Amino acid sequence: MDEDGQVLPQGGEGEVCIKGDNVTPGYENNAAANAASFTDGWFRTGDQGLFDEDGYLKITGRLKEIINKGGEKISPLEVDNVLMDHPAIQQVVSFAVQDKMLGEEIAAAIVLADGASLSESELKTYAQQYLAKFKIPKIITFVDEIPKGATGKLQRIGLAEKLGL
């Protein structure tokens, strides 16, 4: 669905919403959560996605993680997928950092593959081949390990603070 609650055509990217007998009718005793999560009986999952040409649902990211760089909306998952294709990279997580002028800017935490070397400028040159200029991370930090949350999952939100950026 789009931001106005309209169902999008195949290929249109928006929030994944579900409805049916197997979907909860709402949160018990939590009117605020219900108002934020339900629209005309549709449960808003917080996931971003689209139906591909074969009719399969493709999850493209989480709405809370979308980076708003001067009004441009950037999926960190898209940036991750491009950077992960570089042979020197073992793991990557792209995330938002605060920017005085643009509101948010893109950063990426990179774990290099064993024995690999890669400079920030080499990675940016590589990314220019596959990403629009405004989607290339401004800040690239190389780390031995990407911090994880309490559940062991990589968490984009709050990563800038954990890395001191």
Predicted regions, residues:
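Short helix-loop capping/hinge motifs at secondary-structure junctions, enriched
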Residues: 5-7, 117
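Active-site loops of AMP-binding adenylate-forming
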Residues: 1-4, 30-33
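General small-molecule cofactor/ligand-binding pocket signal
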Residues: 140-143
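Active-site glycine/GP-rich loop and adjacent strand/helix microenvironment
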Residues: 9-10, 26-29
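FAD-site-proximal beta/loop scaffold in flavoenzymes
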Residues: 41
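AMP-binding/adenylate-forming catalytic core of the ANL superfamily
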Residues: 15, 20, 25-26, 33, ...
